Amino acid sequence: MSFDPNMQKLYIQDVTLRDGMHAIRHQYGLDHVQAIARALDRAKVDAIEVAHGDGLQGSSFNYGFGAYTDWDWIGAVAEVLEHSVLTTLLLPGIGTVHDLKHAYEMGVRSVRIATHCTEADVSKQHIEAARNLGMDVSGFLMMSHMIDPEALAEQALLMESYGAHCVYVTDSGGAMNMDEYAARCQAYDRVLKPETQRGVHAHHNLSLGVANSIVAVQNGVVRVDASLAGMGAGAGNAPLEVFIAAADRMGWNHGCDLFALMDAAEDLVRPLQDRPVRVDRETLTLGYAGVYSSFLRHAEKASSDYGVDTRSILAEVGRRKMVGGQEDMIVDIALDMVKAR
């Protein structure tokens, strides 16, 4: 896809209020989401994603219960937005078309339909439903590092055929390097229509979130996911204020107020972190072992409950190639390790 960020504007998608839910076990207060959304809106971010960390209706025993419902959070944010597009995330099998319609009624105008990178076919019903509602819709291929670029591109092609306006290379494990990201973006170019946008969703587990986002843009990506102070699963997403600063220095057209984003990250988001969102021995293990970033807090709880090193649990998760939705197996792994002592 031909895209020149010096001439054409990037689409900046904030995920602080969705992926960032993972970092605090989905416990944002309504005053928190309003304050953060208001700051992002004033900083002229293009879109703000709001939902439980695992998407609409993710609040459950398996994923963790939210402090509020998706509708509470979405309603609170809808009240304060004047510029940014209200967006949400839906995983087929967790959220339903009924939920999608309700989100639309509440003011959501853009949705990302997320599947594991080999399961694009389960997104068909939901992408088509979103298009029928008149929504902007993206396909979101999670754990994109787990299959080769050509196979990923074939999955992206399916999402495009269902009606997706954009398809993401989603590095849920923060496990990819710059060459691997570039290869996947280039594979998309070989099969997708020029008018279908590409997106990047990077995690920072190997400290490459910003670097991978930059390389993705250099390879034709238009939509960039990022979060204030990196607020997200694992070591977090590409930090929004850092990406914007880097983009600014490169002369890219992003339309955001850098200092306002810095202030929001420092004053509103960082104080909410009950566990620092950073690269440390546990989050580094996620990227090193290629593990779904949202498994971090689940593995840390299992470690505390059963006295097993978090890193050992995560390494075994990676060895078994577990994917999102298998959170309950983390306890099984911890119990197996206790039994093997």
Swiss-Prot record:
Residues annotated as catalytic: H22 (proton acceptor)
Gene3D superfamilies, per database record: 1.10.8.60, Aldolase class I
Coiled-coil region list: none
GO biological process: catabolic process; L-leucine biosynthetic process
SUPFAM superfamilies: Aldolase, post-HMGL domain-like
Classification via InterPro entries: 2-IPM_HCS-like, 4OH_2_O-val_aldolase, Aldolase_TIM, DmpG_comm, DRE_TIM_HOA, PYR_CT
Organism: Rhizorhabdus wittichii (strain DSM 6014 / CCUG 31198 / JCM 15750 / NBRC 105917 / EY 4224 / RW1) (Sphingomonas wittichii)
Residues that bind Mn(2+): D19, H201, H203
Keyword terms, alphabetized: Aromatic hydrocarbons catabolism, Lyase, Manganese, Metal-binding, Plasmid
Segments forming domain Pyruvate carboxyltransferase: 10-262
Family of the protein in this entry: Belongs to the 4-hydroxy-2-oxovalerate aldolase family.
Enzymatic reactions: (S)-4-hydroxy-2-oxopentanoate = acetaldehyde + pyruvate
Protein name per UniProt: 4-hydroxy-2-oxovalerate aldolase 3
Gene Ontology molecular function, alphabetical: 2-isopropylmalate synthase activity; 4-hydroxy-2-oxovalerate aldolase activity; manganese ion binding
Residues noted as binding substrate in the record, renumbered to the chain: R18, D19, S172, H201, Y292
